[in-house]
Amino acid sequence: MLNRRRVVQGGLAAAGSLTVSAPFRARAQGKPPVKIRYSEVVRAILYAPAYAAITNGYFKDAGLDVSLTTAQGGDKAVAALLSNSADIALIGPESAIYVQNSESPTKTPIFCGLTATDGFMLMSRDKIDKFEWSMLKGKDILGFRPGSTPILFFEAAMRQNGIDPLKDVKLNNNIAIPARVGSWLAGQNQFAIFIEPDASQLELDGKAHFLASIGETVGPADYTTFMATDKYIKDNPAVIQAWTDAIYKAQKWTASQPAADVAKAIEPFFQGVNPKALAAAAERYRKLNIWKDTPKIEPKAMERFQDILVQGNVLDNAKRVKFETLVLTEFANKAK
């Protein structure tokens, strides 16, 4: 969710070719674990496999000592990378795209995928037995910050279903993230998009009803990815491989375990959230194939992502970034 005009400039230039070293075996060799400063864009169940990698000890087993911080914004997370206050960040691909197009000498290539598409749900105030997208016409809808990926993906979903988001609906995009649920409960808007666990909790409370998955509607377009500076990756390829291996293990575990077990694994990161909402959210994301089961990122998914940015007028078509520039595929290809 990064505005390209706010990309932080700076960092060190990196040169030379990337060479992937042998798998990282710090623990096996008795070496102290490598400390990783990890920044996630926001706290969300959408990133459950990453939390599972921590609670299940996959990072630890890979010889990584992970320190997690929540940036509260893609611009802040990528700024942490560029200022060398974070080593690895979980952000949307738009961050890497905007940095690539900026004057910053340091770039932030993607090396591992986590989510296959958008994780927001379209919800209604009243129960609708047979939803049709045309029902949104003329209605007030609680959206998201202008230019952010949640609203861009929602607009793309509407366009796919014959709705002009600029003319056919009234999008209320000026509600701050912490105030969105409260605004809905106060009776504002007839429809809304919510991420988990808010969507499931509102359903459990009878305050909203599920209509459609934005991500399922839009299709594969890797929504959140791991990235680091080109210099960090060049200097620490074994660490990047170890990270990718740990995420792959977590992806396979998340895909195979009961929703209740996934909810239990991520519960420490969602203090105070109803366990039933966590389990319902986990089951929904898995059913909708929102979580990737591999760290590999496909060119078509990145093309689709950039299509959405172009349609939303936050990326000039002439400034699309080539897949081979945007994504380093060698780490995901070797993940085990």
Spans of features found by a protein language model:
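Aromatic-lined ligand-binding clefts that engage carbohydrates, nucleic acids, or primary amines
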Residues: 19
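Sec/Tat signal peptide C-region and signal peptidase I cleavage site
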Residues: 24-27
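Short, glycine-/small- and polar/acidic-enriched structural segments
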Residues: 29-166, 170-174, 180-183, 190-196, ...
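Predominant activation on well-ordered alpha-helical scaffold segments within soluble catalytic domains
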Residues: 51, 97, 155, 200, ...
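Pocket-lining segment of extracytoplasmic ligand-binding domains
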Residues: 95, 178-270
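Secondary-structure end/capping motifs
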Residues: 234-316
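Conserved C-terminal helix/tail region of periplasmic/extracytoplasmic solute-binding proteins
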Residues: 306-336
